Amino acid sequence: MNNAKLQLPVCIILAAGYSKRLGQPKALLEIKGEYLINNIVKKLRKHDLEILIITNKELFDPINNSTKDAEVIINPRPEMGRTGSLQVGLRHLKDNFSKNFKTIVVPIDRPGFSNATISKLISLNSTSSPMKNGKGGHPILLSAVDISKILCAEPNIPLRDIIAPTRFEVNDNYLHLNIDTEDDVKLLLDYYIQDESNF
């Protein structure tokens, strides 16, 4: 990871869940001949962002072996949930790269954001997230102040109970896509067909 680029937000992709309801790893869903995780990495790299992927030990090898332009690390306790996974990534960045940085958090199962939304998040300094029709979505930009709050919290506490992002309205038609079922996977494929300009 390039320290010089840490003036830009660092992206943390959360991909440590076991996808029990879907029955297959969300990161390894195949989209146009590539894993979903690779599609998201490519999308973020277009903005010249550094990327850190947090995953579990079972998915580490397939993700690490197939994903370029990103660092991959293991969350040893993925059962603690997303906040715990995020803490693993934030501590890794603080310990190895910078004590003061912003980060864009991208859950693997919420890929329906546009390039315009990423550009907007990059331009902001306070903790912020997109919304569509008044409902909040992902990714979330975390300020350095809120990163400290998250690191001090218990790992099983939902992020919404720790921070309060400022929201901005976007036109992302698939912002609220949440990959959890086979029907959601069909919507994901529709998204990649209809919004090719975002990839």
In which residue ranges do the predicted regions lie?
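Short aromatic/basic micro-patch
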Residues: 112, 141, 178-179
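Glycine- and other small-residue-rich loops at beta-strand/loop junctions that grip anionic moieties
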Residues: 106, 139, 177
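Short, well-ordered alpha-helical scaffold segment located
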Residues: 112, 146-149, 184
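Nucleotide and nucleotide-moiety/phosphate-recognizing core
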Residues: 3-106, 111-130, 136, 167-172
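Residues that scaffold the ATP/ADP-binding catalytic core of kinase and kinase-like folds
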Residues: 21, 116, 149-150, 188
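Flexible, gly/pro- and Lys/Arg-enriched active-site loops
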Residues: 119-162
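Short, surface-exposed amphipathic charged segments that create phosphate/polyanion-binding patches used
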Residues: 87-90, 144, 183-187
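Conserved alpha/beta core of the MobA/IspD/sugar-nucleotide pyrophosphorylase nucleotidyltransferase superfamily
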Residues: 2-9, 152-199
